[in-house]
Amino acid sequence: MEGLTRVPVREQEPEVRAANFEEVCLGYNEEEAVAEAKRCLNCKNAQCMKGCPVSINIPAFIAQVKEGNFEEAYHIISESSALPAVCGRVCPQESQCEGKCIRGIKGEPVAIGKLERFVADWAREHGIKPKKAEKLNGHKVAVIGSGPAGLTCAGDLAKLGYDVTIFEALHEAGGVLIYGIPEFRLPKSKVVAAEVENVKALGVKIETNVVIGKAVTIDELMEEEGFEAVFIGSGAGLPRFMGIPGEQAMGVFSANEFLTRNNLMKAFRDDYDTPIKAGKKVVVVGGGNVAMDAARTAKRLGAEVHIVYRRGEEELPARKEEVHHAKEEGIIFDLLQNPTEILVDEDGWVKGCRVIKMELGEPDASGRRSPVEIPGSEYEIEADTVIMSLGTSPNPLISSTTKGLDINRRKCIIAEEETGATSKDGVYAGGDAVTGAATVILAMGAGKTAAKGIDEFLRNK
């Protein structure tokens, strides 16, 4: 039956890409994009839109792609999304828009993410920019953090005529998009920098190297700098560890540090002096997308890489596409296993891991079956580098320097889901700073929600 399978997307061959940092997925060309768009049934009650956290008008943009009207398709997408070239690459479409596509009932869903990426890339290559607000409305808003939540909130507010300034702690804008996601999944200069420039083209100002809570506080921004509202999108950058013996050894990294050195500080390039030690044999602890990113990065730096995860393959939280790519590239999965100790040599360097085998017991609070240790099953894995990918928490610097800002026991800022409003008047928050580490698109959705909340707040002030 015609249209059951999607147009294949071109990729680098596994044996080639495992030795370079070029983008794995090569995307659609114009002919392929039009052919894939023609698979869309243009449903009147489009379920795909219900799966999109930023509410892109998916049938409308795909209808324009069908006709070859790529510029119009871009403007439809950019009405809702500030980062389409990013989302088309890293969003978990399989559980969101594509997961609700009617085509998926009797075949493969329409490749919505790949079409979004194509449109955004086409627009960038042809110099097409999002439409700017005609005039300012006289209100100043500060945005803390230039990650997906901050960029989205700032972009949406700028479109409504607000005078928006983003304050970024690092020397480069992009947040987790530049320090957390590898080049082979999300090119920095070609894609992320261009998306940031598009947000700036809307009139948003970005000040880098400004640590809010240290250089200036939120109270000072509002009381002395004239900002009438503040959005906190500072992310969750503090890594978690297991608390097992040997974690302080040299050769133990958090995935956050390992990826930041490579992605932001370009440790993988010979013309940069950023120190990194991938070693010959790397153990990555964890099973999420960040673990896959760390493992695939270490592989490209020449190491044999093992992913050690305490549950089975069905329970891996990483996207299936990322797991598939990791396996293709030769990453070894040691599943239903968990480290109990990091082994250290006499000089203080990692020499291996002691690991215990696990089995799945009863479901835990998340609905997943709890891993249970199998007594007497411990053994040792040789390794000279261990990368811990166990999630991250928000940095308490902002919350500890802002009077009246409530946080929960996990140090996450408490914000209303419907508006992004916090306990402090005029201060809004969203993304990982509120939820803990989550996806790019969920952070964008939170930034979008907060922009609406801020707009309503200032209109009624």
How would you name each of these model-derived features?
Residues 433-459:
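A conserved FAD-binding loop/helix module that cradles the flavin
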Residues 163-166, 170-201, 206-207, 295-341:
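Rossmann-like dinucleotide-binding cores of NAD(P)H-dependent redox enzymes
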Residues 139-165, 291-299:
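N-terminal Rossmann-like FAD-binding beta1-loop-alpha1 element of flavoenzymes
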Residues 72, 135-136, 140-144, 196-244, ...:
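Feature captures the FAD/FMN-dependent oxidoreductase FAD-binding
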Residues 119-135, 194-211, 239-301, 408-418, ...:
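Glycine-rich dinucleotide-binding loop and its adjacent helix/turn
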Residues 248-279, 363-437:
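FAD-site-proximal beta/loop scaffold in flavoenzymes
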Residues 42-67, 86-119, 165, 172, ...:
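Iron-sulfur cluster-binding cysteine motifs and their immediate structural context
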Residues 17-35, 57-89, 106-133, 262-263:
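Ferredoxin-type iron-sulfur electron-transfer modules in oxidoreductases and energy-metabolism complexes
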